[in-house]
Amino acid sequence: MVATGGQAQKQSQNQKPDVLSPTSAVTGLPQKRYYRQRAHSNPIADHSFDYPARPEDVDWRSMYPSIQQGQQVSFADIGCGYGGFLVTLGEMFPEKLSIGMEIRVKVSDYVVDRIAALRRKCADTGAYQNVACLRTNAMKYLPNYFAKGQLEKMFFLYPDPHFKRAKHKWRIINQALLSEYAYVLRKGGLVYTMTDVEDLHKWIVTHMEEHPLYERITEEEANADPITPKLYQSSEEGAKVVRNKGDHFLAIFRRL
């Protein structure tokens, strides 16, 4: 269902969990135990989403109250989970607008409430006005939100590996989707990928290296990037991998 203007965003921002979800008395943040949901969602299923017909219809001000005239979203965390890395991006790049895109309703509700709580806590400094979360299916509707060459950075951190061969087509990195990502990513922009599944890592590297619009950056470039250390445990999934002493597989690609 196509929604005009900022209708889709306002609906996403106004969504609340089915039960009253108290905040932590210590942190003042919403508690994840009230927002539990399955680890993954079928991206091919016919979920009911409202989405803009074109990027010009997106009402970004409903998500970024302090957005400046002409300012655009620069960073997109695709499948942002519970928003740990998204919040880190907001702290690292206060002058940039970052959006988290998450398909799971309760998880996206949590991130929206988390950001709202952080904004209240930091009302005197205006922190976290530069981050927001949107519930949508990025595999279907990404070009509805972003103009050609708009994004500087895209992040795919610990995506669903879809282990069964029959479900590989559901993986968020594939040849068709890589062309869509290239469309919304500016030349010289970066795609960051991180997973704890070696087979998925090899799949990602193979597909991106085969695509004519990407090149993998060198290890030296990756190590010099201030974002790289944050990829390992800023997200909740990454922190879990660290706790379990699991492997991390990183690959960063440049848009040609």
From Swiss-Prot:
Give the main location.
nucleus
Q: What lineage is this protein's organism placed in?
A: Eukaryota, Metazoa, Ecdysozoa, Arthropoda, Hexapoda
Compartments reported by the entry: Nucleus
Q: Which residues cross the membrane?
A: none
Question: Which residues are recorded as binding S-adenosyl-L-methionine?
Answer: G79, E102, I103, N137, A138, L157, S235, E236, E237
InterPro entries recorded for this chain? SAM-dependent_MTases_sf (IPR029063), Trm8_euk (IPR025763), tRNA_(Gua-N-7)_MeTrfase_Trmb (IPR003358)
Q: Name one Pfam family in it.
A: Methyltransf_4
Q: What start-end ranges are recorded for coiled-coil regions in this protein?
A: none
Q: Which residue intervals make up region (Disordered)?
A: 1-24
Known role: Catalyzes the formation of N(7)-methylguanine at position 46 (m7G46) in tRNA.
Q: What is this protein called?
A: tRNA (guanine-N(7)-)-methyltransferase
GO terms for cellular component: nucleus; tRNA (m7G46) methyltransferase complex
Which GO terms label this protein's molecular function in UniProt?
Answer: tRNA (guanine(46)-N7)-methyltransferase activity; tRNA binding
Q: Report the sequence similarity comment from the record.
A: Belongs to the class I-like SAM-binding methyltransferase superfamily. TrmB family.
Keywords, alphabetical = Methyltransferase, Nucleus, RNA-binding, S-adenosyl-L-methionine, Transferase, tRNA processing, tRNA-binding
- Write the Enzyme Commission number(s) for this entry: 2.1.1.33
The metabolic or biological pathway listed in the UniProt record of this protein is: tRNA modification; N(7)-methylguanine-tRNA biosynthesis
Q: Is tRNA-binding given among the entry's keywords?
A: yes
The record, for HAMAP family, names: tRNA_methyltr_TrmB_euk
Active site (record annotation): D160
Q: Which reaction does it catalyse?
A: guanosine(46) in tRNA + S-adenosyl-L-methionine = N(7)-methylguanosine(46) in tRNA + S-adenosyl-L-homocysteine
**Keyword Methyltransferase found:** yes
